[in-house]
Amino acid sequence: MGIRVGIDVGGTFTKAVAIESASGALVGKVTVPTTHHAPEGVARGLVEAFSSLLQRTGIAVGRIDLVVLSTTQAVNALLEGDVAPVGVVGIGPRAHRKEAFRRTRIDSVQLTPERRLPVFHAFLDAEELSEERVADTLRTLMARGARAIAVSAAYGVEDPEPERRVLDVATALGLPATAGHEMSGLYGLEVRTLTAAVNASILPRMAETTRWVEQSLATSGLQVPLMIMHGDLAVSPLEEARRLAASTILSGPAASVAGALLYHKLLDGLFIEVGGTSTNVGVIRQGRPVMKYVRIMDHPTCLRSVDVRVAGVAGGSLVRLRGRKLAGVGPRSAHIAGLPYPCFVPPEMLSNLRLVTLAPRPGDPEDYAALEDDEGRRYAVTLTDAANALGLVPEGDY
């Protein structure tokens, strides 16, 4: 009997589950910490979860006929600002240069109240797209700080050839790149440009992750194609995430909604999932997930997805201080900061603690709260710890 495996790479934990293909019966499940800081990135935790699942259940690799991945890597990259600066190349006919320039120009993109995506803009006349001119433009954008390219041409949905020329040159220069026509066939130059920029900003992270995943799982003897879930509940080969990374922005939440529909048989309901890094809230209506176009802050995109609100606050979110007063929570989590939760540490280790502040990652504000002991060991201050300290968590739960 065939086995299907689902693996979810979250911001804090990576989960793997096996079910029988015919009946849908649960065979086994495992949870391991997500390995952000490993040389292989989150792929190491994914492989650890997969290997542990096979060991715990005794499933032979040859019985597996499908492996589907879901991930919050893309949405967490946006929430936490772990994105690549983008160079936007606008293209338009000389006769409409001023209009096309204005509609493709993006100064920066607000990702969260505190984080913006750096964007650098350049414009090319459609009549002057020589390889040399395009290459010079891309090198100039790189010199300004761009690490990925988004190209968006007026009338690109009708004639994508100008965008393809820029993509070819970007590839030759080793730059990850996205074109507006790849993101949508809909009209709306501004929205296509923004969506392409967001996609380009997470291409480096997703390309690295997918490469490590493919290489790592190949060593296990797995012969079936690896698939990934998109935000609209579609499933495609994993290599699609290298090109259309933004389509996986709500991959994790979409998988959760699909699970709720499959196992709870809901007709109408509100779906809430609290993870370690982010919290998802979605709606199920008449037995179907509500669908809409994704918005990033106040920015509309071309990405159609399940209607899920993602908040950068969850069980592992770090508390932030202004002076001695609470200033906020998140988006950084204890896992990203590499700090243990005090409520899971033996009480005898938690003595002579003092409150300090720190920056979880280079470039972060130094206003995240932590506890430090006399030996310099530090512990996170998270919502999970606060709930336990306040007695809100029943004995035996966590």
Which residue ranges define each predicted feature?
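N-terminally biased helix-coil "hinge/interface" segments that flank
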Residues: M1-Y398
